[in-house]
Amino acid sequence: MLGAMLHTLLLLLLAELGALLASGPESQSSFLEIIFPEKIEDKTHSEEQISYIIPINKKQYTVHLQKRYFLTNRFMVYMYNQGSTSFHSPNIPAQCYYQGHIKGYPNSVATLSTCSGLRGFLQFENVSYGIEPLQSAFTSQHIVYKLGNKEKELIFNKNSRNIEMPTNYGILINKKPKSPFKNLFPLYLEMSIVVDKALYDYLGSDSNIVTNKIIEIISLINSVFAQLKVTIVLSSLELWSDKNKIPTVGEADELLHKFLEWKQAYLTLRPHDVAYLFIYNEYPNYMGATYPGKMCTAHYSAGITMYPKDMTLEAFSVILTQMLGLSLGISYDEPEKCYCSESICIMNPRAMQYGGVKSFSNCSLNDFEHFKSNEGAKCLQNKPQMQRTAAAVCGNGKVEGDEICDCGSEAECGPDSCCEPNRCVLKAGRACDSKSPSSTCCKNCQFLPEKHQCRPEKHLYCDIPEVCNGSSGNCPPDVTINNGHVCKESGTICYNGDCPDLDRVCESIYGAGSVNAPFACYEEIQGQNDRFGNCGKDNRNRYVFCGWRNLICGRLICTYPTRMPYNPPNNSTASVIYAFVRDKVCITVDFGSSVKEDPLRVANGATCDLDRICLNGVCVESRFLRDQSKTCSSKCHGNGVCNSHGVCHCNAGYSPPNCQYPTTKRSASLWSGKHDLPMERASKNQEKKWLLSLYIVLIILASVFLIGTGWKGLKQCGSKEEESMSSESKSEDSTYTYVSRSTSETSSMTSTSS
């Protein structure tokens, strides 16, 4: 019977794959902006409906959001390790996904998650923006970037066929009436997704990262299917993390057939309406395959979809939406006969090339009504139990749900534990769990006293130490001085509580006299794009070339102050490279696999050029951060600075919220757990004024004395012997590269004239 059905197999031979950019902001279009989204608080404090103000390109947009649920309460992630299967409930909250619209733009769609900062997409009528938090979500800093658009050139595989439109859908598509939307009742499509090994690696080789990206795709798809009152529910996710379980190369019908056989053998016990295999292919000949109109036919409810190189999640969600639409009996639109309220309809063959909101056309709705009238949607009428709260598991070492504490198993907890291991509550007489990593204000199961420092400052002028409040075992959240506050005379600005000083880092590694190398050294070493000089690695473990503008934002290169070879401490696997460039000896080290984080990776916030800082390997303008910090701190009346929440943090002797009036009470800001600004910092300006007055008086006295003694000496001295000047010849600039792999290995030297 399967062979008889293959003639209805629909191949998506769409070659519009090109130059749709990767799903990270670093490879998006040139528009990229650092922003500070602001949540609009309401009196109800309900999280079911929330709103944000999001600035884009100097304009404020108000986004209204409604919570959406599309993970089943039995949702599991399946993985493989050396052939054995493991499954787990992912550590991902199910109640932080939202959909909504942008105020004043009736055809807009917002698809965002709030699990850790704001992450997702803002889709206007013909343009889309991605938004995601920077590394430290507590700073409220996000980046917003413009997604690819229809102007991008198309890249074709040299073996790919021309664009073909399917000719036989098994559905009547001509002369579609322009009927209004009919009343629809809610339907639920349970989906099981399988990710092949290549795509798993391409998306990050990390189960949490890949799971989050798949959920983002499902969220985008739901924003389109909401028009049909269809909710796409993710029931299970399988990651082929070690190797593929079936071959993933070949013709579309062959792959679909193999996946269908595998699905029937291995997914039987996992409830689902349809199963899809996502395959990574850099330049595929086709986009996917499925059986049109067979969603509720168990032996044919499957599909495969290709994920090309450099494709955005938004573009891939369009492909998957079209595939699911075909399975639901919805054919491709004929543009001259079908219309929708958007600039392009979702079932238009070229929809994936366009940014912005997309919707189903009148033709699509008629197709779907026809599909339902023939009982094609009977399997979609049962509503699965949705996962609305994270299920707490007592004994796993994580505090979840209503748990007060969780120290793990009985053996892990031990007899001295503050926590009851089987009930996850505190033992009688215990105030807190001192074994919990987050309980830095707890000792011997009791609260530490008020004012006890629980988190030291990273930098004197960019951070403030947190102290315990005496009534909680947890240290207050980390709040820093606002990013953009100038922390050094050279113009360096605060970033995430630190004052990134490359000279200081060089000195700490190589000793006194070592400073950040001149740009010529970065050109020489970073230009090689190898383990010594690069801007990180991509998803395929290849070194990323920094580009001329971003050379200083890769790996740190320093000047070397001595003639003794550098010996990395306690690291026999490290390799050292020296470069002699324009009379400077420059150095950098590859620490190899012995370190988890590269200590020479240039930190975010480090200065890379005039009025520019490094941000995720890119040299970007710092003007916005500086201006935002100045504007915020201007409301502190010169007696304080803004913190990372945009609230004045007052100098000693001044009271919040605006540091305008003196106070006898020591209170730095409205945020509890914070000391005042240090006294030496608060009185810095007054001290400078006093010292300046003293210097002026001393200078006047010294001048009077020197004039008197100078006149006397002038009489006694008739002439002065001239000194001869010695001249120095200067050699031409040369570049020398010396690589020392270890003390036992042979050293080599190459030279090129510049």
From Swiss-Prot:
**Would the keyword Lipid metabolism be found if you checked this record's keyword annotation?**
no
Give the signal peptide, or none.
1-22
Domain Peptidase M12B: from-to ranges = 187-384
Which parts of the chain does the record assign to the membrane side Extracellular? 177-689
Annotated region (Disordered), positions in chain: 720-754
* Cystine residue pairs: C296-C379, C338-C363, C340-C345, C454-C475, C632-C642, C636-C648, C650-C659
Instruction: Give this protein's Gene Ontology molecular function annotations.
Output: metalloendopeptidase activity
**Gene3D superfamilies, per the entry:** Collagenase (Catalytic Domain), Disintegrin domain
Q: Where is the composition biased (Basic and acidic residues)?
A: 720-733
Q: Which GO terms describe its biological process?
A: proteolysis
Could you tell me which residue ranges the Disintegrin domain spans?
Answer: 391-483
- Alphabetically list the UniProt keywords: Cleavage on pair of basic residues, Disulfide bond, EGF-like domain, Glycoprotein, Membrane, Phosphoprotein, Signal, Transmembrane, Transmembrane helix
TM region positions = 690-710
SUPFAM superfamilies linked to this entry: Blood coagulation inhibitor (disintegrin) (SSF57552), Metalloproteases ('zincins'), catalytic domain (SSF55486)
What membrane topology does this protein have? Single-pass type I membrane protein
Give residue spans on the Cytoplasmic membrane side: 711-754
What is this protein's tissue specificity according to the annotation?
Expressed in sperm (at protein level). Highly expressed in the testis and weakly expressed in the epididymis, brain and heart.
Entry-linked InterPro entries: ADAM_Cys-rich, Disintegrin_dom, Disintegrin_dom_sf, EGF-like_dom, MetalloPept_cat_dom_sf, Peptidase_M12B, Peptidase_M12B_N, Reprolysin_adamalysin
Q: Which CDD domains match?
A: ZnMc_adamalysin_II_like
| PANTHER family the UniProt entry points to | ADAM A DISINTEGRIN AND METALLOPROTEASE DOMAIN, DISINTEGRIN AND METALLOPROTEINASE DOMAIN-CONTAINING PROTEIN 32
Name of this protein: Disintegrin and metalloproteinase domain-containing protein 32
What is the native source organism of this protein? Mus musculus
